[in-house]
């Protein structure tokens, strides 16, 4: 059994929705055990509430549990072309795992969201840098998801990983195409993890 962790941070719910789609795709793969968790919130509760943050029910992960998984699919909103501060804070606590090589050879993939589309690819590739330092095997999705060829509408989605465009005010929710790409990413990564674990 290959253990897959979908680990995310979501303030307004877009990445949370994408995380569930990623997990749905991963759950299609026989031999995959899928867990969804989130990184801890670092904002003060009153500031989080004033900013319109959405309460989420996923359990909170700890850095120490990451070696328990064969693949980790990270989800983070874009903050100025980078991962969110909450995800950065979480990953900055993995120094002990890095020192011991605990994540070496594990699969890693990334999905993201942006307000207007700016920085979605940069967020994914800049997150890869941290994962590469851990010796993780980075898994992009390429162009196998046919939705990536559709240019008839505004949508997220890149060969690097699934994305969604939330709109400047956060009112746009992930489209069916974006969710389909996210499901593909989950299924693809889980399939690789099962093969490598087999």
UniProtKB/Swiss-Prot annotation:
Keyword field contains Hydrolase: no
Required co-factors: FMN
Organism: Citrobacter koseri (strain ATCC BAA-895 / CDC 4225-83 / SGSC4696)
InterPro entries listed in its UniProt record: Flavodoxin/NO_synth, Flavoprotein-like_sf, Flavoprotein_WrbA-like, FMN_Rdtase-like_dom, NQO
Boundaries of every Flavodoxin-like domain copy: 4-189
Positions with a binding annotation for substrate: 98
Family affiliation: Belongs to the WrbA family.
GO MF: flavin adenine dinucleotide binding; FMN binding; NAD binding; NADH:ubiquinone reductase (non-electrogenic) activity; NADP binding; NADPH dehydrogenase (quinone) activity
Record-given protein name: NAD(P)H dehydrogenase (quinone)
Residues holding FMN: 10-15, 78-80, 113-118, 133
Keyword set, alphabetical order: Flavoprotein, FMN, NAD, NADP, Nucleotide-binding, Oxidoreductase
């Amino acid at each position: 059994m290959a253990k897959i962790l979908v680990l995310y941070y979501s303030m307004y719910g877009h990445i949370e929705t994408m995380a569930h789609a990623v997990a749905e795709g991963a759950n299609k793969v026989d031999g995959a055990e899928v867990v969804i968790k989130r990184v801890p919130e670092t904002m003060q509760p009153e500031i989080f509430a004033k900013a319109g943050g959405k309460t989420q029910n996923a359990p909170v992960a700890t850095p120490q549990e990451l070696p328990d998984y064969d693949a980790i699919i990270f989800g983070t909103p874009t903050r100025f072309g980078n991962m969110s501060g909450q995800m950065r804070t979480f990953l900055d606590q993995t120094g002990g795992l890095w020192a011991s090589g605990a994540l070496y050879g594990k699969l890693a993939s990334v999905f993201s969201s942006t307000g207007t589309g700016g920085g979605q690819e940069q967020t994914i590739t800049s997150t890869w840098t941290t994962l590469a330092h851990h010796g993780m095997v980075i898994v992009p999705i390429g162009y196998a998801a046919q939705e990536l060829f559709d240019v008839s509408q505004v949508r997220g989605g890149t060969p690097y990983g699934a994305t969604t465009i939330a709109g400047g005010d956060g009112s746009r929710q992930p489209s069916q195409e974006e969710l389909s790409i996210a499901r593909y990413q989950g299924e693809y990564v889980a399939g690789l993890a099962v093969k490598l674990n087999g």
